[in-house]
Amino acid sequence: MKRPLLFVTLVASLMFFATPVNAQSFGVRAGASANPDQFFFGGHYETRPLMEHLTFRPNIEVGFGDDVTLVAFNIEFAYWIDLKNKPWKVYLGGGPAANLYDSDSETDLQGGFNLMVGAQHRGGLFGEFKVGLIDSPDVKFTVGYAFK
């Protein structure tokens, strides 16, 4: 791993330890993406609602495979939809992404945008599907756990 990639990854990971006092939760995630074809893992934190049903849910995902390492810094918002009398909530959202691609020949920072839909159980388990635009991975399938 090259020094710039290691430095950016280290600095970005510090944001998870400096969560604001009003942070509602944080979580872990893992999954698979297409184009590049990778397995990834990461983490997120989520604020209390900024307005009714809308939260800020930034995350970092580190992917390996397809002869490239990808560190994705996703600045995403989620709009939550309550399912009456059900233990699950559905969310829709998206936001911009800064994608750091590192291959044998070069390191490149590219902008992207994600659209997502997901469902989260009140116990914390969640599943998420993302579609990437511009220079984000084409699709991502994610499972994870949000700690409360």
Where are these regions (language model features)?
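Predominantly the C-terminal beta-signal and adjacent terminal strand-loop region
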Residues: 53, 109-111, 118-148
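Solvent-exposed loop/turn segments connecting transmembrane beta-strands
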Residues: 29-41, 62-71, 100-109, 129-142
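Residue-level detector of the transmembrane beta-barrel scaffold of outer-membrane proteins
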Residues: 25-29, 55-59, 89-93, 126-128, ...
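Gram-negative (and chloroplast) outer-membrane scaffold detector with strong preference
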Residues: 42-104, 147-148
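Membrane-embedded beta-strand positions in outer-membrane beta-barrel channels/transporters
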Residues: 27, 40-44, 74-76, 91, ...
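Bacterial N-terminal signal peptides that target proteins for export
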Residues: 1-8
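Sec/Tat signal peptide C-region and signal peptidase I cleavage site
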Residues: 17-23
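Bacterial N-terminal signal peptides
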Residues: 8-16
